[in-house]
A protein has these predicted regions:
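Glycoside hydrolase catalytic-domain context in secreted enzymes
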Residues: 1-399, 423-1003
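Short beta-strand elements
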Residues: 399-427
């Protein structure tokens, strides 16, 4: 064995324990009347709801396609819990209904039903159950995902009629009732007004051990400590984005920066059911400010606020609290939200009576606003406007108390420019955006002129009025004065958005890199750069035009160059590139675990929203460190995640992957996850950059967003992940941003990402992305052009017919993901070499992307393996049913037009064995697989052989005894990609395969 190989161990028990903790700590307890939870020892429980037999471990699409041996759902976990007794007769009733009414499965990708049809119940069923039980638990399930938004209809956003009827009847029969919401995102909560259950919990989608986390909370083994990452409004219509969230090709972000609580806490407090950051516990906490200090280093971003907060568990059971810190900033010329989250911290597990001191150091840059039109006198600049700044601390945005009442966190007399930027990404379409204004002005003598917070005189008057009261009452009264007197002065207005004034193409031309003279035949390899024997420039100068055109192409899905069944290979996609020591780097779908389409098992994690609801950076880091070890074991270098778009609207189908309506929380949780992966030498690819906040028509959707809203909301999470989390890989989105596809948007992937944030990694497109035509990127100021046929472009991309690579490379989006064959660059329609010849692309721009790719590849595990320094990971304590063996490499056999017959006579067919087959097929075509073989068992035998595509069973072929004769089983399948992996699983001994014939079906 090479002495440089690292030997590492992945303890499956510890991995499971950490995921289970996350699945418990992310649960949000919204209501617990009469303290019906936790369940007492010996509680008799009736479990209602069809969802008990259809637990959703994650949402749908690439973010949830993790192949697992077993999912422990809520019902199974409850049945195995020894401290409670389940109503078995009621469970059997649901079993019978499920057998007679099989779950709906949909027709494939983007077509899974949001929920299953509920079982009708009678009053008699509920009364009988109530006689046998102490409490009813009703389970409601929902899913959505990639290519599948939620809808404002029953069974999706709204409860169905049968679900409402179930809740009514259970409420009428039971004195104690809890509702569990197994959903990927928040749903309509109006049922609370009518049914009023005693306890309500969002249990989200907890991955493969999610049910265990739920039961830990229900029984009190874990005290709930999750907090909402979104505002739950009274109705869908209350969200300010709703009128511009739809199914067309244009989404106008008219609400601007006023997303989620930034809107509700400013002007619609009465439309909130549960505020951002809300979450109950089985105990109570007292939060007190012990120190607030301003460190005056110099004006601007280096100023910090030091804050010490003491948290005491004043209840009678151990628990954890989440302390949230919000800023209140002067309205100034720009207008601000009433509160903005600037930090948070979670306590340790505090026993009853125990205290913990939490120390915050908050850069005041987090208080700054972006001026995209020059209202402050500093255009394209982060600015602290003059006035008073206050801090509010609490367990949610609504209940946070001002801790700087006497003097303010700090005050400034003149505007402070914090960081000067360049105009970038501004809209090309004029529209009116929401602004915040105040009804209190200096001209109104009966009201204070300073409306952005209580003045010192206000505070003094309030303090005098309640001098005899206790400290807590004083804080409450001051808070009351602040809100009632000043916050209600804010109101909504609309003003024209600032539009683009620069020439994008001119900026590209003025910043072209210098070309490296071609240096043929030097014989340098990438490890020479790694070892310091040559520079990256010297190495890149060796690449020919052809090799430069190859290296900007990722190969997939299921490239034979890397782990079978993964999303793509990039870097060494041709023999010439590999001879130069450039490894083939493997990336795989995430973020809820690895998607291994070869059929091997992987760990399915809780969904992104649930992980963010923990408000726990360290837990997220630890969990993703385990995932990093699992990636090493499977030779996966990059996980395509985390997904960090903003919950702009509750109906976005992909909200389950994303974290929050708040960009700061999003960036902090993303940074923790990225750091966990990087501890193991692997990377996360943050996505989808940016404004991917809808799935309907996501390839053609143009998001019209102000530069201020982009920088403060939709880019902020990415910025934090890059600057603090040190993310080294970014994936652009499918759609357009202010008139240009993000895959070809120079100001996004170069001006902002690289030049302003200091990013030095790689940027890749989403899979089979559309690239904006050159006439759009060169003349995109109007935002008006004839859009191409997106469906045709997608079909062409699947089959390797490509367009407009020049616009992608010119934007410094380094990698097109994906092509069927990375080494072949002729005849596929990509314009890379033609653009070089015509002068629409320079060799220097290709060299720039090649250097980005090589710098990244040089630090991957793939590179370490190439030079004998890789890791060997051993899994300990894995269950016997987990297929965690290292994935074998698979040969892809091309199926010609006349078909292919593959000899299977050497396949053992031993019970429990698997056989992998790889085929190169035409994407989008339908194929017939005809298996021939014999069964040695008796004629009444029923020997199962299951045919899988990835982890999805296409058909279980039941073989009866054939007495040596040949029998045939046929399966049809429509492909979505070129390289496809199939698996035969032999459930019993006895079947001897002869061959399989694959033919393309006629359309």
């Amino acid at each position: 064995m090479d002495n440089h190989i690292r030997l590492q161990t992945l303890d499956w028990d510890e991995y499971t324990k950490t995921a289970r903790q996350a699945a418990a700590d992310g649960i949000v307890l919204l209501r617990n009347e009469k303290s019906v939870l936790p369940l007492s020892e010996g509680s008799r429980v009736s479990l209602f709801g069809r969802a008990q037999l259809s637990y959703y471990k994650s949402g749908t699409g690439s973010g949830g396609m993790v192949n697992v041996a077993h999912v422990t759902g809520i019902r199974e976990a409850l049945e195995n819990e020894k401290s409670i007794r389940m109503n078995r007769e009621l469970l059997h009733l649901y079993d019978r209904f499920n057998d007679e009414n099989p779950p709906r499965t949909g027709n494939g990708w983007g077509d899974d039903p949001w929920s299953q049809d509920e079982m009708p119940v009678t009053d008699a069923i509920c009364r009988e159950a109530a006689e046998e039980s102490d409490i009813a638990i009703v389970l409601i399930g929902r899913t959505a995902g990639e290519d599948r938004d939620n809808r404002d209809e029953e069974g999706s956003w709204k409860l169905s009629g049968l679900e409402l009827d179930l809740l009514r009847k259970v409420r009428g029969a039971f004195g104690r009732m809890a509702v569990l919401l197994n959903t990927g995102n928040i749903i309509d909560m109006s049922f609370l007004d009518e049914v009023s259950p005693d306890a309500v919990l969002y249990v989200w989608q907890g991955g493969m051990v999610g049910g265990l986390g739920v039961v830990d909370v229900l029984t009190g083994r874990v005290n709930p400590s999750g907090h909402l990452t979104d505002t739950i409004a009274l109705s869908l219509e209350d969200y300010p984005s709703v009128k511009n969230f739809g199914t067309g090709d244009l989404d106008i972000y008219q609400e601007d920066i006023y997303v989620g609580y930034r809107y509700f806490e400013s002007v619609a407090r009465d439309r909130v059911r549960f505020p951002f950051g809300y979450g109950l516990s089985y105990t109570s906490f007292e939060i007190r400010s012990r120190k607030v200090e301003t460190h005056e280093r110099e004006a601007g971003s280096r100023l910090t606020i030091d804050l010490d907060i003491e948290v005491t568990n004043v209840g009678d059971t151990a628990g954890r609290s989440v302390v949230q810190v919000y800023a209140r900033c002067p309205q100034g010329s720009l207008g601000k939200a009433a509160r903005v989250l600037v930090d948070f911290m979670k306590t340790d597990l505090l026993e009853a009576g125990q205290s913990q001191l939490l120390s915050f150091r908050i850069p005041v840059r987090r208080f700054a606003s972006y001026d995209d039109e020059g209202a402050t006198g500093d255009v394209s600049c982060w600015v602290l406007e003059e006035g008073r700044y206050d801090l509010y601390v609490g367990e949610n945005v609504r209940d946070a108390v001002c801790v700087t009442a006497e003097s303010g966190a700090f005050s400034i007399s003149n505007n402070w420019p914090i960081e000067q930027m360049e105009e970038a990404l501004m809209p090309v379409r004029p529209f009116d955006r929401m602004v915040m204004k105040s009804s209190i002005t200096e001209e109104e003598p009966d009201t204070p002129a300073y409306i952005d917070g209580p003045t010192a005189a206000d505070i003094a008057a309030a303090a005098s009025a309640i001098a005899a009261a206790g400290q807590e009452e004083q804080e409450d009264e001051v808070q009351h004065i602040d809100r009632d007197r000043f916050d209600r002065a804010l109101y909504i207005d609309y003003e024209p958005v600032a539009v683009r004034s620069i020439d994008d193409y001119k900026r590209i031309f003025e910043n072209l890199p210098a070309e490296l003279p071609y240096a043929l035949g030097k014989g340098l390899v990438l490890n020479d750069v790694r070892e310091g024997r040559c520079t990256m420039d010297e190495f890149i100068a060796q690449l020919s035009d052809k090799e430069l055109a190859q290296i900007v192409r990722g190969e997939g899905m299921g490239s034979p160059l890397v782990t079978p069944g993964t999303a793509a290979a990039f870097g060494g996609v041709s023999e010439d590139l590999r001879e130069m020591g450039i490894p083939a780097v493997c990336c795989d779908d995430g973020p809820s675990g690895m998607r291994l389409d070869c059929g091997n098992h992987a760990f399915s994690l809780p969904n992104g929203t649930m992980l963010a609801c923990t408000f726990d950076r360290e837990l997220n880091r630890k969990l993703f460190s385990f995932l990093g070890l699992e990636m090493l074991k499977n030779r996966v270098d990059c996980l395509l995640g985390p997904g960090i778009n903003i919950h702009r609207n509750p109906l976005n189908g992909r909200n389950f992957e994303y974290f929050s309506e708040d960009p700061f929380l999003t960036g902090e949780i993303a940074s923790a996850q990225i750091q966990g992966l990087q501890e193991q030498g692997v990377s996360g690819v943050i996505k989808h950059f940016c404004a991917n906040n809808r799935e309907s028509r996501r390839r053609t959707m143009d998001s019209a967003v102000s530069e201020r809203a982009l920088r403060e909301i939709y880019l902020k999470g990415f910025e934090i992940a890059v600057r603090e989390g040190k993310a080294r890989a970014v994936m652009t989105s499918y759609g357009l941003l202010n008139g240009i596809h993000t895959s070809s948007l120079y100001d996004l992937t170069t001006t902002v990402l690289r030049e302003e944030w200091g990013f030095d990694g790689i940027v890749m497109t989403d899979w089979w992305s559309t690239l904006s035509p050159k006439d759009v990127t060169e003349n995109g100021l109007t935002g008006e052009y004839e859009k191409p046929d997106e469906d045709r472009l997608f079909r062409d991309a699947l089959n390797g017919k490509l367009y407009d690579f020049s616009s992608m490379v010119r934007a410094q989006n380094d990698l097109y993901m994906v092509v069927p064959d990375g080494k072949t660059i002729s005849g596929d329609g990509a314009d890379t070499l033609d653009a070089l010849e015509e002068g629409r692309l320079t060799r220097a721009e290709l060299q720039r992307s090649a250097a980005n790719i090589c710098r990244f590849a040089m630090e991957t595990e793939a590179m370490r393996r190439l030079v004998g320094e890789g890791s060997t990971v051993t899994v300990e304590n894995a269950p016997e049913d987990e297929n965690l063996d290292s994935v074998e490499m698979v040969e892809y056999r091309k199926v010609p037009e006349q078909g292919l017959v593959l000899d299977l006579s050497q396949v053992s067919g031993e019970k429990g064995s698997d056989y992998l087959m790889g085929f190169e097929l035409e994407a989008g075509a339908e194929y017939l697989f005809e298996f021939e073989g014999s069964c040695r068992a008796g004629e009444l035998a029923q020997v199962p052989v299951t045919f899988f595509f990835t982890g999805i069973p296409l058909k279980t072929m039941i073989w009866n005894g054939t007495d040596g004769d040949i029998a045939c089983h046929a399966v049809s399948f429509r492909t979505r990609k070129r390289n496809n992996i199939f698996r035969l699983h032999f459930g019993q001994n006895g079947v001897r395969m002869r061959d399989v014939k694959i033919t393309k079906c006629r359309e």
